[in-house]
């Protein structure tokens, strides 16, 4: 009798361990734009303040402006300082994004060429068959040669992010400052690249970030040459 009571007393109740594995959700992907030097100078530090316009879980994909070849950008930290890009993982998709970008540029060039030909034909007809329209077209092409340098110097990068608004805004700041993008044609090209590479559901965040930099920060104004 005493043996049974001692065996019963030796048993103790144990609670089964509980492991939280999370929701196992996958974040969507976005696109942004970066300069070549900014992509290699990510700073590690405290997390950025959350914006009320940022979505809870989303992912950005960036445009990285490069002067040489595009290398794979990787990271193991979950946050950087306030002046850097906040992501959980960063990886490049140069093949698909570059091909899509080239197709967009080809279509845009064809539309512009058709418009110029129609205008040149109308001008030459009004002048009685003047053949100077070709020279005007060549001059317009030379004047617009610096245009669309944002697209030419950029590489699309897919990035996972929890704060897409802040990431879009930070990417715009880096491109404008490091590439000195102050002409309206270049700024319009910058905005168009963000909109064309991202899903329409992210367009309000992109437009909001662009308008915020335009109206509040004065970032798109060229720096004054005067030094006080």
UniProtKB/Swiss-Prot annotation:
Residues 1-14, 54-79, 92-101 have a biased composition (Low complexity). Residues 107-120 have a biased composition (Basic residues). Residues 157-216 form the OVATE domain. Keywords: Brassinosteroid signaling pathway, Cytoplasm, Nucleus, Repressor, Transcription, Transcription regulation. One of its GO terms (biological process) is brassinosteroid mediated signaling pathway. GO terms for cellular component: cytoplasm; nucleus. Probable transcriptional repressor that regulates multiple aspects of plant growth and development, partly through brassinosteroid (BR) signaling pathway. Acts downstream of the kinase GSK2, a negative regulator of BR signaling. This is Transcription repressor OFP8.
